[in-house]
Every structure is written in structure tokens, then in C-alpha cells.
């Protein structure tokens, strides 16, 4: 989740910078795989405090399904209300939902008081990032287009790239502070992977991170 959101925030400096994914087939396939894994994780959860984290793949599946629908809708009704609704829904999940949900999911699992407070601080940072990005989405204009085989999101005005740091604190650092090894290892991989993808695959940053 942090790779997708940070990719958007750091890559949209101008309307020409791309935020992309591969195809409808790839998006729907990813949605199916992550949805099934999320359903399995939720069904095997034995404690309520683990449910928010177990449900993460389900939300990601919804996000990928939205992109798949955009791939199918854009060629036939690019200016229609359906495309705009799909675009806004994807950006809501990518930019507003994840910086709130990720640290709260990690905090729900945490039993160590100090770690809970630290993760809670990351959640506050995420709230600030989400509120700022919500204002950007409400005040600006946003469109998805297919160009050169990629799905590109164009926002005017573009959000400040600096907010990407706060987004990464919420979605990456928050889970990394967990006492659960699987959670913080995943967070570390996400953060380091996003840096590597940003440096090595600038033009295709989010194409790399969608999967």
C-alpha cells in the first residue's frame, strides 16, 4: 500500500509524470489472488485484534479491481461519470484510506504499551496526510487516461511531494514498529522496496509497485 501511494505522491510533479499499471487482465488477476488470500487470512484469524491486518489483502483486491474496471471503461466512456467515480474511488483508497488504516491495523495487534504509543503517533501523522490529501482530491480535478499502454492518473493541482514523507511514516514506519516480526518485516520490505523502485524504475515506479 505504501508503494502505491508514495509512488503517486512522488511521481506527480507535473501532469506528464506517470502513475501507471499494466492491464485489465493483470489488475483483475491481482485482485483475484489477493482477494482469495485475504479471505483465507480472515477466515483463519482467531483473535479480533488481528482482523484489521488480515483484511489488508481484501482492500488491496478492491483497489486492483477498480483499476481493472478503469481499463475496460476508459476506451468507451472516458468522460463519463463511471470513469470519474472509479478514478475517485481508486485515489481515495490509495491516498486517504491507507495512511489511516495501515498504522491502525498495526496498532490493533500490538500489546506492548510503548510500541502502541509510537504506532499511534504514526497514525496521527497518517491522519494529517490523509486530511491534506482529501483536501487536494476535493479541490482539484482528477482524471485517468490510457497512454502508451499504461494507466495514468493526472491531478491538477498536483499534491505536494513532501506529503509523501508523512505518508511513508504512516504506512511504512507504523507497521515497522510492531513487535510482530511478520508485520515489521513486511513493512521494512515495503519501505526499502519503494526506495529501490523509485531510484531504479522512475518512469515505471508504480507499474513495478502495483504487483
Segment roles from a protein language model:
Residues 55-59, 185-195:
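Central hydrophobic cores of alpha-helical transmembrane segments
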Residues 28-37, 94-107, 163-175:
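Hydrophobic cores of alpha-helical transmembrane segments in multi-pass inner/ER membrane proteins
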Residues 15-34:
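Hydrophobic transmembrane alpha-helical segments in integral membrane proteins
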Residues 38-42, 68-122:
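Internal transmembrane alpha-helix with an interfacial aromatic "cap," most often the third helix
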Residues 105-170:
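Membrane-proximal helix-loop-helix units in multi-pass membrane proteins
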Residues 36-41, 139, 154-188:
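Alpha-helical transmembrane segments in multipass membrane proteins, preferentially the mid-helix core
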Amino acid at each position: 500500500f505504501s508503494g502505491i501511494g508514495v509512488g503517486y505522491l512522488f511521481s506527480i510533479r507535473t501532469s506528464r509524470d506517470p502513475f501507471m499499471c499494466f492491464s485489465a487482465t493483470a489488475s483483475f488477476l491481482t485482485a483475484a489472488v489477493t482477494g482469495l488470500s485475504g479471505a483465507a487470512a480472515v477466515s483463519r484469524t482467531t483473535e479480533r485484534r488481528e482482523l484489521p491486518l488480515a483484511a489488508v489483502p481484501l482492500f488491496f483486491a478492491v483497489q486492483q479491481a477498480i483499476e481493472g474496471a478503469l481499463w475496460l471503461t476508459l476506451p468507451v466512456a472516458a468522460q463519463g461519470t463511471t470513469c470519474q467515480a472509479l478514478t475517485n474511488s481508486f485515489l481515495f483508497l490509495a491516498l486517504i484510506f491507507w495512511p489511516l488504516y495501515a498504522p491502525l491495523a498495526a496498532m490493533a495487534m500490538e500489546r506492548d504499551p510503548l510500541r502502541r504509543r509510537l504506532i499511534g503517533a504514526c497514525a496521527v501523522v497518517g491522519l494529517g496526510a490523509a486530511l491534506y490529501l482529501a483536501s487536494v482530491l476535493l479541490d482539484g480535478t482528477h482524471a485517468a487516461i490510457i497512454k502508451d499502454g499504461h494507466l495514468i492518473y493526472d491531478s491538477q493541482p498536483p499534491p505536494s511531494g513532501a506529503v509523501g514523507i508523512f505518508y511513508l511514516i504512516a504506512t511504512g514506519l507504523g507497521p515497522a514498529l510492531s513487535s510482530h516480526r511478520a508485520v515489521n518485516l513486511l513493512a521494512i520490505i515495503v519501505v526499502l522496496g519503494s526506495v529501490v523502485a523509485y531510484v531504479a524504475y522512475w518512469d515505471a515506479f508504480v507499474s513495478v509497485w502495483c504487483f
